[in-house]
């Protein structure tokens, strides 16, 4: 099983690359790692806010996969600020949970 130290190092590695190469407005760690829980199936879940991204989600992920090098299983969710605002107005429980329980790694709190 992967140790907390290994996850912490990989999170730092990925976040540094994101800041340097992808230039997001905000990065939030969510899921089990944000809660400090490590299980066999744990991966790194990152919620990213960025204004200038492709229209479709799959294109956003392809863009990230081409830029960012990572060693551990990492999932990215990318929203434009206006998409985030819209999801919150709709009361999206998934997004609300990320913002309430996630850990801001980069950007204003």
Placement of each model-derived feature along the sequence:
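Catalytic core of pol beta-like nucleotidyltransferases
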Residues: 1-26, 35-40, 50-109
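P-loop (Walker A) phosphate-binding loop of NTP-binding proteins
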Residues: 32
């Amino acid at each position: 099983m992967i140790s907390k130290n290994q996850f912490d190092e990989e999170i730092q590695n990925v976040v540094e690359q994101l800041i340097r190469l992808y230039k997001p407005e905000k990065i939030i760690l969510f899921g089990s790692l944000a809660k400090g829980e490590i299980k066999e199936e744990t991966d790194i879940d990152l919620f990213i806010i960025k204004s200038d991204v492709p229209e479709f989600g799959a294109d956003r992920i392809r863009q990230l996969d081409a830029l960012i090098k990572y060693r551990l299983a990492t999932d990215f969710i990318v929203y434009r600020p206006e998409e985030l605002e819209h999801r919150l107005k709709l009361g999206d429980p998934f997004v609300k949970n990320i913002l309430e329980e996630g850990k801001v790694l980069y950007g204003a709190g």
